[in-house]
Amino acid sequence: TGEEIELKKTKHIKESTTDPECGLFHKGEKQKCFAYSHMTICDRYGYVLFNKVAPGNMHDSAIFSEIYNELIQKYEAIKNVCLDAGFNTSPICHQILTSGRVPFLPYKRPMTKKGFFKKYEYVYDEYLDIYICPNEKDLHYKTTNREGYRVYESNPKDCEGCPFLSKCTHSKKHVKTITRHVWESDREEADYISVKPQTLPI
């Protein structure tokens, strides 16, 4: 007909026909089931302060972000927030610190492929806003993605003949990419708090 037709991308979402409010929960890599997730927040003595039921496909960190503001409005005297490693994300650390509370979270090891350099081996220069690789080459800021991560990339000319290339990237274009959340400094502060001597008993 010669008419222009606008095509829109669709997203396939699995939904329970008997209970549409639940979510698809992943039990490992292969097992899946429709379920709910339940989060309980207690004080230091084990008394329940707050609880939340959410669809099983919601990550614990997303559930926490929703209920945290309600929690501190109801219990203004809260000074410290102690969570497990699954909550050690930049947005949560930012949320706790900007509310005037102190986060206590165990250090979360970076998930890196075996044989590759760890992220901490790339030094971030806050003043120049660049990363410096183990071969002392610069990775410059490229863009910020929708998830709130700043993307840094190397110059392929620096990487082509680098003796550490196989431990750095498998990119066919010889480009190393590192991401840094816009609130990464808050997570770094939380990591610093976690290694203080007075924090260890907690």
Short names for language-model regions:
Residues T1-I202:
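Anion-binding and metal-coordination hotspots
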